[in-house]
């Protein structure tokens, strides 16, 4: 393992520890259970799952470090010149599904790939981001989420936040329903336009920003009263989350195609979901406002 890979791995393991500690403290009841695993083809990881807490219904914060002799199709499809290279992939990926429909679901991921071939220079890149999926949107929360994202990107250039915000909006879009999964945030891949140290610093800035972006929203909403109808709507909207993760998500596809650990890959799925045939929200309702106002291509920082 190279010095670069060792540095990334040390950061990711520490990030997983810090995020789990912060989420446990915010929940106040449940604790993460760790399941360390090894991958027969090379590598392993630490899956950490929290369930049935006071705030978190189900959540997972996973670290993985896998390697192999050939990049899987999901990783080489848009870079065919890398087909046949050996690879190492390291990352932390998390999804948090709260009980309360007024608390959004959150997702974050930071990852590092390096593809190598004897006699040639290694090719490396970073990817990741974070995004928010509210069920009952609150503008204050959306602005806060995007403000933290913008500030994390600011030291790396004025164009970084708008570019990766737009990429997030494009990526987390359910094409078969023509609707966004949530209110976005940041998404990026193939980050190597800077030197390694700057690229690594950028990834650390994004990874470290997640808790600052998410926990203030959780604190504001976790005690809000909700009805059985609102809970049903949350479960209905979770169906969209499942659809995206199983049909489009690059991380899910990479994990399954590379022989990753299925339980760890699918820990992102919510525990209770519902689908209703051709269900539509009542006009003028809070549920209708989610898609009409919040799930749109919006610049949340334009007037704030």
Swiss-Prot record:
It comes from Pseudomonas savastanoi pv. phaseolicola (strain 1448A / Race 6). The gene is hemF. It is found in: Cytoplasm. It catalyses: coproporphyrinogen III + O2 + 2 H(+) = protoporphyrinogen IX + 2 CO2 + 2 H2O. Residues 241-276 are annotated as: Important for dimerization. Its EC number is 1.3.3.3. This is Oxygen-dependent coproporphyrinogen-III oxidase. One of its GO terms (molecular function) is protein homodimerization activity. The lineage of its organism: Bacteria, Pseudomonadati, Pseudomonadota, Gammaproteobacteria, Pseudomonadales. Keywords: Cytoplasm, Heme biosynthesis, Metal-binding, Oxidoreductase, Porphyrin biosynthesis. The keyword Oxidoreductase applies. The keyword Phosphoprotein does not apply. Belongs to the aerobic coproporphyrinogen-III oxidase family. Gene3D superfamilies: Coproporphyrinogen III oxidase, aerobic (3.40.1500.10). Pathway: Porphyrin-containing compound metabolism; protoporphyrin-IX biosynthesis; protoporphyrinogen-IX from coproporphyrinogen-III (O2 route): step 1/1. A divalent metal cation binds at residues 97, 107, 146, 176. Homodimer. Substrate binds at residues 93, 109-111, 259-261. Its cofactor is a divalent metal cation. The active site is at residue 107.
């Amino acid at each position: 393992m190279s010095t670069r890979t060792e540095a990334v791995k040390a950061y990711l393991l520490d990030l997983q520890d810090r995020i789990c500690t912060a989420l446990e403290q915010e929940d106040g009841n449940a604790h993460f259970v760790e399941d360390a695993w090894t991958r027969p083809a090379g590598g392993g990881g630490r899956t950490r799952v929290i369930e049935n807490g006071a705030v978190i219904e189900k959540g997972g914060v996973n670290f993985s470090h896998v390697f192999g002799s050939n990049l899987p199709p999901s990783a080489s499809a848009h870079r065919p010149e890398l087909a046949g290279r050996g690879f190492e992939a390291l990352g932390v990926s998390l999804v948090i599904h709260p009980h309360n429909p007024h608390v959004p679901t959150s997702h974050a991921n930071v990852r590092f790939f390096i593809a190598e071939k004897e006699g040639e220079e290694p090719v490396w890149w970073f990817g990741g981001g974070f995004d928010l999926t509210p069920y009952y949107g609150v503008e204050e929360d959306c602005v806060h989420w995007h403000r933290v994202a913008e500030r994390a990107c600011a030291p790396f250039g004025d164009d970084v936040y708008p570019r990766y915000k737009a990429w997030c909006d494009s990526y987390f879009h359910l094409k078969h329903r023509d609707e966004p999964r949530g209110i976005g945030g940041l998404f990026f891949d193939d980050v190597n336009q800077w030197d390694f140290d700057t690229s690594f610093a950028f990834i650390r800035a994004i990874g470290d920003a997640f808790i600052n972006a998410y926990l203030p929203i959780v604190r504001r909403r976790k005690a809000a009263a909700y009805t059985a109808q609102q809970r049903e709507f949350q479960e209905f909207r979770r169906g969209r989350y499942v659809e995206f993760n199983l049909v489009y998500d690059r991380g899910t596809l990479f994990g399954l195609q590379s022989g990753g650990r299925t339980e760890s890959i699918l820990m992102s799925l919510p525990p209770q979901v519902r689908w209703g045939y051709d269900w539509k929200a009542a006009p003028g309702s809070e549920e209708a406002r989610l898609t009409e106002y919040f799930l749109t291509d919006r610049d949340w920082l334009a007037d704030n």
